Amino acid sequence: MQNNRYRLRYLPLFYDDLNQKLLYISDVLHNIAAANKLLDSVESAIKERQFMAEAFEPYESLCERQHPYYRIYVGNFVVFYVVIDEGEAGKVMEVRRFLYNKQDVEQKIW
């Protein structure tokens, strides 16, 4: 059986988004357990999607993009990623943003 796993790449902006949310939960809300649980859930969701990154409906953006965005819902948050075909090197699942689901997404992923 062929391994169809996409290579993973994370943008620094994703890490900034994630760290901001985790610090808020752990330091402001004083809930370290919830922050750790969120981190584990995000990591698991991304790893699960790595095998089928293009099997889900693309996000309908208001502007045309070279690579369509896909979403992974994790509780009240959304992970945004794109798939980039790098030819013989294979396909990359590039994880770009981690946003609260009530944020103005179009403004954040522009």
Q: Where in this protein do the model-derived segments appear?
A:
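A short, hydrophobic secondary-structure junction motif
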Residues: 13, 42-49, 72-80
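Residue-level preference for short coil/turn positions at secondary-structure junctions
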Residues: 4, 65-68, 89
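Solvent-exposed interaction patches of small proteins and small membrane subunits
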Residues: 34-38, 57-60, 64-65, 86
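A short, surface-exposed loop/turn module that caps and links secondary-structure elements
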Residues: 46-72
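Enriched for short, Lys/Arg-rich terminal
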Residues: 70, 74-110
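Generic structural signal for secondary-structure transition and capping sites
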Residues: 30, 47, 51-55, 77, ...
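Arg/Lys-rich, positively charged N-terminal/basic patches that mediate binding to nucleic acids
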Residues: 1-41
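Conserved protein kinase catalytic domain
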Residues: 22, 43, 96-99
